[in-house]
């Protein structure tokens, strides 16, 4: 029986889609959309909402495709990523480059046409920072790759805000700071239970270079900092009681996970904490949105 993979149109499309890391792209776009709605007391113009969502999503996908291209040999050595079409050699380097270029070009054009030049240039800079500075320089060179490189991944709320207002005020940077501080514990938890993967691939992730105990301590410390930072929208007056209540409850659960990881680590616990960290960020930003529109109604 011939078991060779047949590249039907459907399977080929799914391979290209996989290069864009759809789940990560969705979370980035979600945070950008929340930034759009928080930027205005009313509703976001449909043209800006649609154009900003599509444009940011396309440029994000373009950056992730470049990441898959650069890391195809590394991905092939890691169980978590060995399935990727780029790692398996199912899509050529030229095809990935062409795909990324088309996505990036369409994304830039969409943002320029439907939002404003500032959003286009900020988005290009953001995802170049991820695809080039983080992927090529930081990730293979320093265990602080996630901390420094997290700046590019934290930008989506500012991109969304800029799409609506043409500016990036202080409130937008608070949202960026939340994601920036969230990024290290989110990825370090993953790196703990995938330590062998990173070690085999020669990547200097924190558990590989500094050990498990050091990483567990820093997950706890960053989660404490994150809890404090998530109070800033309420303190600054950007958000009210609905958000504050949500941030405290969600943060308390995250802190409980971080404390358990520090005191009594297991891979199973780390997996649950990693999954929760994604749920945490999604619900936190959803709470910002609900509070934004509920606050004038309930007066809190």
Swiss-Prot record:
| Reaction it catalyzes | heme b + (2E,6E)-farnesyl diphosphate + H2O = Fe(II)-heme o + diphosphate
User: PROSITE patterns from the xrefs?
Assistant: UBIA
Q: Which residues cross the membrane?
A: 24-44, 48-68, 94-114, 118-138, 146-166, 172-192, 217-237, 239-259, 278-298
The miscellaneous comment for this protein is: Carbon 2 of the heme B porphyrin ring is defined according to the Fischer nomenclature.
Domain of life per record: Bacteria
The EC number(s) this enzyme carries: 2.5.1.141
Q: Name one GO molecular function term.
A: protoheme IX farnesyltransferase activity
Going by the UniProt record, its keywords in alphabetical order are: Cell inner membrane, Cell membrane, Heme biosynthesis, Membrane, Transferase, Transmembrane, Transmembrane helix
The record ties this protein, via CDD domains, to: PT_UbiA_Cox10
An annotated GO BP:
heme O biosynthetic process
Instruction: Look at the named UniProt entry and state the broad enzyme category this protein falls under.
Output: transferase
Pathways per UniProt: Porphyrin-containing compound metabolism; heme O biosynthesis; heme O from protoheme: step 1/1
Q: Tell me which InterPro entries the record gives.
A: Protohaem_IX_farnesylTrfase (IPR006369), UbiA_prenyltransferase (IPR000537), UbiA_prenylTrfase_CS (IPR030470), UbiA_sf (IPR044878)
- Official protein name in the record: Protoheme IX farnesyltransferase
Sequence similarity: Belongs to the UbiA prenyltransferase family. Protoheme IX farnesyltransferase subfamily.
Task: Identify the species of origin.
Answer: Burkholderia thailandensis (strain ATCC 700388 / DSM 13276 / CCUG 48851 / CIP 106301 / E264)
Q: What does this protein do?
A: Converts heme B (protoheme IX) to heme O by substitution of the vinyl group on carbon 2 of heme B porphyrin ring with a hydroxyethyl farnesyl side group.
Under the cellular component aspect of Gene Ontology, which terms does the record hold?
A: plasma membrane
Q: Where in the cell is it found?
A: Cell inner membrane
Q: How does it sit in the membrane?
A: Multi-pass membrane protein
């Amino acid at each position: 029986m011939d078991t060779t993979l047949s590249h039907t149109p459907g399977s080929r499309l799914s391979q290209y889609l996989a290069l864009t890391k759809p789940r990560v792209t969705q979370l980035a776009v979600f945070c950008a959309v929340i930034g759009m709605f928080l930027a205005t007391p009313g509703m976001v113009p449909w043209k800006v909402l649609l154009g900003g969502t599509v444009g940011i999503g396309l440029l994000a996908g373009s950056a992730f495709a470049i990441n898959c291209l650069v890391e195809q040999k590394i991905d092939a050595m890691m169980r978590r990523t060995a399935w990727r079409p780029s790692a398996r050699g199912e899509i050529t380097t030229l095809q990935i480059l062409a795909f990324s270029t088309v996505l990036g070009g369409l994304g830039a054009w969409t943002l320029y046409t439907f939002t404003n030049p500032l959003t286009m240039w900020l988005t290009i800079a953001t995802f170049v920072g991820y695809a080039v500075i983080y992927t090529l320089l930081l990730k293979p060179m320093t265990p602080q790759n996630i901390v420094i490189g997290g700046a590019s991944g934290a930008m989506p709320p500012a991109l969304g805000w800029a799409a609506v207002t043409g500016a990036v005020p202080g409130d937008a940077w608070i949202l960026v700071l939340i994601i920036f501080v969230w990024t290290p514990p989110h990825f370090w938890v993953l790196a703990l239970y995938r330590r062998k993967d990173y070690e085999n691939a020669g990547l200097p992730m924190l558990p590989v270079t500094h050990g498990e105990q050091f990483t567990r301590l820093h997950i706890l410390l960053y989660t404490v900092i994150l809890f404090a930072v998530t109070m800033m929208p309420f303190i600054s007056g950007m958000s009210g009681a609905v958000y504050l209540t949500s941030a405290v409850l969600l943060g308390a659960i995250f802190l409980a996970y971080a404390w358990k990881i520090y005191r009594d680590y297991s891979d199973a616990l780390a997996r649950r904490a990693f999954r929760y960290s994604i749920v945490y960020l999604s619900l936190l930003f959803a709470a910002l949105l609900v509070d934004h529109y509920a606050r004038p109604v309930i007066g809190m």
